[in-house]
Amino acid sequence: CSNISMATKAYEFIKEEPPVLVDWMPWSHVAGGNKAFNLALYNGGTFYIDNGSPNPNDFAKTVKNLTDIGPTWYFNVPKGYELLVTEMSKNTLLAKSFFKRIKLLVYSGASMPNHVFEQMEKLSVEYTGEKIFFSAAYGASETAPMTTMPTHRCNFPGNIGVPQFGTEMKLIPFGDKFEVRLKGPHITPGYWNDEIQTLKSFDKDGFFKIGDALKFQDKSNPDLGFYFDGRLSENFKLNT
């Protein structure tokens, strides 16, 4: 509940208009089973199961579902958005349905290609007259999942925003990067039946060591948010 409360507080429109989601994410994944499903439940919204997926061989189902039902909040991975903007560029019925009441577009899990971000903004202006808020989100299973989100419009992809309400963030210098550690009511208390891993995963102040590095968009203005700067042990993310 704490993670859903954080998101609701960050985006006031959710209270004014109960969210409508059309979502493909498996409920075995914390983003689908907690964030997406409970966002609708917590706010008296409507949750439609998308039986498609961001896979070229399965995306036709998603196209049909989004043509039938336009969401107000939409989440996908970058590959899903790439397939979506390609289809909307030639499918007017899909684009009209998708944009008729959309308020927020969210992606996570990988880097968003610039051309996909720009094409989505172009389509949103074409069908709504304005740029729809299109943002990255950051977190992990242990953070329920989202722990940062942007609160201002970004003109380019990748900004993961600032800590959500109730989240404490600690930044530890790590070479030319900052290791990020997190604390809040949405953070897991530990790993089931694994005391050793639990002890290794928290510092002496109770901050969860997520294992990632971040960098400021602008060090002189932290309110502008952060960018993901790789794992501490590796500096790459898969595209999907």
Regions found by a protein language model. Give the residues of each.
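Ser/Thr-glycine-rich phosphate-binding loops at phosphate-binding pockets of nucleotides
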Residues: C1, A140-T143, I210, L238
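Conserved adenylate-forming
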Residues: C1-W24, A36-F37, N43, Y48-K177
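Conserved helix-loop functional segments at active or binding sites
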Residues: S5-F13, K90, E126, Q197
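Residue-level signal for well-ordered alpha-helical positions
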Residues: A7, E87-M88, D194, N239
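Conserved AMP-binding
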Residues: W24-V30, F37, S53
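Conserved ATP-binding/catalytic segment of the ANL
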Residues: F178-L238
